[in-house]
């Protein structure tokens, strides 16, 4: 195997792990996300000039899935049911003030609730 194919395999595995974390217990979405990942990787099987960019895209997608996607569930039987968010350990936490600051260093003085 060449080096790009080894890193492509690694990126694919990271993407599958990220889908497992982001879409835990939501099998319909999990299967759809994995199917899309497989389809994209199969569409770009041959090593080309843009292969490193595609591998980087897969790694960035895995990072977004792992750190920024939160799923919510609601009891469908109750009309006034509240949403429960499934926030796992790897979810990026912050507050609105840190978003407004941009690229500057942020000191968070209180825990997010």
Curated annotation (Swiss-Prot):
Primary site of residence: mitochondrion
CDD domains per record: Complex1_LYR_LYRM7 (cd20267)
GO terms under biological process: mitochondrial respiratory chain complex III assembly
InterPro entries linked: Complex1_LYR_dom, Complex1_LYR_LYRM7, MZM1/LYRM7
Taxonomic superkingdom: Eukaryota
UniProt feature coiled coil, ranges: none
Compartment(s) of residence: Mitochondrion matrix
A Pfam family this chain is assigned to: Complex1_LYR
Subunit structure: Interacts with RIP1.
PANTHER family according to UniProt: COMPLEX III ASSEMBLY FACTOR LYRM7
Family indicated by similarity: Belongs to the complex I LYR family. MZM1 subfamily.
Protein name, as recorded: Mitochondrial zinc maintenance protein 1, mitochondrial
């Amino acid at each position: 195997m060449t080096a790009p194919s080894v890193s492509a395999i690694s990126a694919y595995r990271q993407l599958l792990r990220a889908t497992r974390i982001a879409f835990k217990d939501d099998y319909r979405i999990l299967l759809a996300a994995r199917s899309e990942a497989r389809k994209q990787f199969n569409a770009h099987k041959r090593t080309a000039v843009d292969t490193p960019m595609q591998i980087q895209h897969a790694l960035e997608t895995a990072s977004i899935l792992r750190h920024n996607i939160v799923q919510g569930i609601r009891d469908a039987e109750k009309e006034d049911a509240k949403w429960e968010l499934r926030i796992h350990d790897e979810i990026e936490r912050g507050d609105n003030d840190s978003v407004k600051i941009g690229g500057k260093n942020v000191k968070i003085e209180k825990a997010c609730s």
